């Protein structure tokens, strides 16, 4: 009996654990501190800084099953998903990694043992082929002489993509960053399937399928194309879980493995589909994986960056559900089946199930409102189409009006063998794309980040002032030996009390001082293992090797500590009041305010806000001790410490607890006791995206300032109402009641005046072939009174056509009324349109009543004068 996908995942991790590898959890799909990536798209992403020498781990061998998304940017598989056997937006990458430990020999031997060993995957050796980079004689020799693969099954691949190092067997993540030659392992499905070995003209067939890529990480590619040797040669491997599952389960398509079979059946159930071979089922089964995990990792549908990619995938899935005949929202119903089939890899998704379902349901409902109209428009355009290409302007209109991503339009067209003029679409989109490029940091040069080889020791938990030695200086991102007065720079010290921005807490400010110089620090940031002090040298000169006195702004740090501790209390209080589904989605802890984004599907009620505020203040009054303990990550989680999903933690972590009320992993700075916070007040609660709420709050002196400000406002209002703050509510209610009474009396007077005006107007009507025509501009009449006046005049005049106008603050308001017996000849909508056009406006309505507005008041007299001739012509 073949292994399930979950069993294959576990077997891979168990094998490498037995070879001394640390099993590391999958990182978030949102890359941590990497400006070059839209999404995590490979197992090595979370180790990129390790390969570059910017980060250190307490292990030199690691293994992971990494969640990946490829649906945007360079690695974009979206358009092929559902139409091929192996393309996915979401997949799991099994990998083993060596950080300066083993290299080519062990990497190849490990792979061979796992794939062919009787106790592991037990694949037939004669079915395996390998490729190596053309000049990598070492890897070739290991495969031939040590593993024993015949030469005819070892293929050298050169630079087959038109440039040096541009090869299927030379791996690089992007234009810059870690790279190196690789060896790939292929599985031969047999001669009953069409296709040839890698490097042959038939290599695109499905017979020979790549199952494992082993990269020998030797270089860091610079922006100018040069290759710098990495500090230590390393190994990065990747094997798609879905691909190896297809091989081990003896199927030729990833969509036939147990995981996808289960999901496809679930899709069929919620959409009512009966043909399990329908490609739309495959599309939706794939897309629920990427969408659910992206939302769980904090990405929300939007019109930019990651949120837009998510929106595109959701909408593509919804459109395919529509094709299958789904009559109601269905996509969110697949989250439950997905959690079941993912096993241990779906634990975080299970914790956030309600939140993920709500986000997907809301997005589907929003799109469903425009999907039908958009598809109707597209059908119209395709019916009129002459040729085989839809113009870019129509594709843009579908995007702009109905929210159709261009790839969704292309998807519909593809089914009818029609192409989309994507160049024309891009032209129409250029202005929006230009703005998006300016706002986005994605695609930046990874090497543009300051690279510091040294490390800084942070001593700010216990010290706000100490001496440190300058180990590096940077001006405009480039290392320098010295700076002079007036220059802005980044100063790196061997040890520092300054806290670098992390975990939502802002970086410290202060001064670096010495004999004859002062450097004003206005921010502190991390650069790998180093801490950089950003600021300006206000006096003197500073050079590498100098000793400085580092002084943190103590008062500012104190306010930050209070706000950070209050954030932890509020997080715990929110979970108590709203439920365990509350999860942090973002935070800002500054000296002035704390801001906390969290998952929750509706606005908080005033009573809930008050309850959270009261609960936090109760913990402040308890004056709980705030304690920190350093322990192993798994032990901390076992103790119940909350870890922020997507945050990167070391194996040993800092656990911060506040009595029995809150326990979290946190590297920030905090008060000593909760009583130090003094007072906590929530100043706003709002929504930032579907399923995400935001609270802003203040503490200590800031909280007292809001109390005083509120008291001052109440006293000001009481003074205006000639009362005091004790009976303010009664006073305001009395004023509002009196105001309502006066408004009612005023309306009655206006109605009487309108009736009198109508009576006097009726005498001004002229007779046109038995129809009374009344055209008049009224001064000092509110626009909303015109309709009442037209109704009164109709009753008085019998067979009639009426046009009334008024001008308020330079804007023209028009109304036309036509008695029922005349609407066959004169239609109010046409009449009002003719008049409105002359005053720079437009309008419409029913044949017997129509309204319009305009902006050209000066043209009104002439427009009204034209009515009689227009009506006369209609009455002929």
Curated annotation (Swiss-Prot):
Its main location: cytoplasm. One of its GO terms (cellular component) is cytosol. Keywords: Aminoacyl-tRNA synthetase, ATP-binding, Cytoplasm, Ligase, Metal-binding, Nucleotide-binding, Protein biosynthesis, RNA-binding, tRNA-binding, Zinc. InterPro entries: aa-tRNA-synth_II/BPL/LPL, Ala-tRNA-lgiase_IIc, Ala-tRNA-ligase_IIc_anticod-bd, Ala-tRNA-synth_IIc_core, Ala-tRNA-synth_IIc_N, Ala-tRNA_ligase, Ala_tRNA_ligase_euk/bac, DHHA1_dom. GO terms for molecular function: alanine-tRNA ligase activity; aminoacyl-tRNA deacylase activity; ATP binding; tRNA binding; zinc ion binding. Binds 1 zinc ion per subunit. SMART domains: tRNA_SAD (SM00863). Belongs to the class-II aminoacyl-tRNA synthetase family. NCBIfam families: alaS (TIGR00344). This is Alanine--tRNA ligase. It comes from Salmonella arizonae (strain ATCC BAA-731 / CDC346-86 / RSK2980). The gene is alaS.
